[in-house]
Regions:
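Short, charged/polar connector segments at secondary-structure boundaries
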Residues: 1-116, 122-126, 132-133
Length: 135
């Protein structure tokens, strides 16, 4: 799917906002990347897991990632993208954003964990990034 110049402009805006937020947060010593659930919750503390199926989750309830990985460093704590605008990542983000601009749904749901009413992404961080910026 070819993406539009408009969706790429949105990426450049999201990227510029991300860099500004990173610089401000660094000065204030706030966390720079999304929180990782495995830093909050030890596996031994989990009494049960349940598969609720596919749910619609408001983007404001998605607050972090399930596991600490190198991918979480591609985002600000609010999932704004920090990869350079001429990267493969930016091209993929633009394609996802184009889906949102056309009022279509993503072809694949994200997977995540819920803990205390907040959601932590396992798979689908780019989709979350595009959706959070779009909302």
């Amino acid at each position: 799917m070819e993406f539009s110049r408009e969706s790429c402009e949105y990426y450049r805006r999201a990227y510029a906002l991300a860099i500004r937020i990173l610089l401000e947060n660094k000065k204030l010593r706030f966390p720079l990347t999304p929180v990782s659930l495995n830093m909050i919750l030890d596996e031994s503390m989990i009494s049960r897991k349940q598969e609720p199926g596919i749910l619609e989750i408001p983007t404001n309830l998605i607050v972090g990632v399930a596991e600490d990985s190198e991918h979480r460093h591609l985002y600000t704590k609010d999932f704004l993208p920090v990869s350079l605008p001429d990267s493969d990542y930016a091209d993929q983000w633009c394609r996802l954003y184009q889906v949102l601009l056309s009022n279509a749904d993503f072809d694949k749901p994200i997977s995540c964990y819920e803990y205390l009413g907040k959601f932590y992404v396992c798979d689908g961080m780019k989709r979350v990034s595009a959706a959070k910026y779009h909302s």
